Amino acid sequence: MSSTLDTQHDVVVEKQPARTAPPPMYQVVLLNDDYTPMEFVVKVLQKFFGKNSEDATRIMLQVHHEGRAVCGVYPRDLAATRIAQVSQYARARQHPLQCIMEPT
């Protein structure tokens, strides 16, 4: 913390360090469809969400059985980027895989 002296009015002003709140977080949710192969979903989870084979398989099975699963939790911009990357990657390979983001 630093102090400055205003010599004209003899006032000491103490500067407080700025406190910023953490950004709101969003979960990226992978949605089930009837066409995207399970192996492709596992690959997407590994490539874009950094999941190991075991975690990627577990999440893929949750998507398959429950219709959806959380892939990760990120600040809004990063969540939106992950969704765009997955969508572009899936479309380029002719798969209808979809992700959405939801506030935590």
UniProtKB/Swiss-Prot annotation:
Domain of life from the UniProt record: Bacteria
Alphabetical list of Gene3D superfamilies matching this protein: 3.30.1390.10
InterPro entries: ClpS, ClpS_core, Ribosomal_bL12_C/ClpS-like
Pfam families: ClpS (PF02617)
GO biological process: protein catabolic process; proteolysis
HAMAP family: ClpS (MF_00302)
Job of this protein: Involved in the modulation of the specificity of the ClpAP-mediated ATP-dependent protein degradation.
Description of how the protein assembles with itself and partners: Binds to the N-terminal domain of the chaperone ClpA.
Family: Belongs to the ClpS family.
Protein's name in the database: ATP-dependent Clp protease adapter protein ClpS
Lineage: Bacteria, Pseudomonadati, Pseudomonadota, Betaproteobacteria, Burkholderiales
